[in-house]
């Protein structure tokens, strides 16, 4: 349909095209439609005018449900779209965790005994 990292449906003509497309999708038997990166007032109108639920991502609060990309909302990326609220800043925490894991693995301090299966195998020295 449409795409790119820019707001869609900002003119009356573009808004009508999006509404028409949503209607076609609904008439084709879809169980829902995703509205992404469109003005909130347009998402409200589409939600009112089609018979299936709308899921919004950057489309305002008027959609039937909301979705965000987990990596964006958890602060795992350097850049996030305007519509994303970062609920955490895990990027540094994740990088630090991977660095610590790599250091411990290289130094052979991981896995420590607490993180190993330590079954005693009688006669292991007799393996051929």
Predicted regions located by residue number:
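Alpha/beta enzyme core
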Residues: 1-81, 85-88, 92-127
């Amino acid at each position: 349909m449409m795409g790119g990292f820019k707001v869609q449906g900002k003119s009356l003509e573009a808004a009508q095209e999006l509404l028409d497309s949503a209607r076609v999708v609904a008439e084709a038997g879809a169980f829902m439609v995703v509205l992404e990166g469109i003005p909130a007032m347009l998402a409200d109108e589409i939600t009112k005018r089609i018979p299936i639920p709308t899921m919004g991502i950057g489309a305002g609060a008027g959609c039937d449900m909301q979705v965000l990309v987990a990596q964006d909302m958890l602060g795992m990326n350097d850049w996030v779209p305007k519509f994303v609220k970062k609920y955490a800043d895990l990027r540094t925490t994740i990088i630090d965790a991977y660095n610590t894991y790599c250091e411990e693995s290289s130094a052979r301090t991981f896995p420590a005994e607490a993180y190993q299966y330590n079954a005693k195998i009688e006669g292991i020295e007799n393996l051929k």
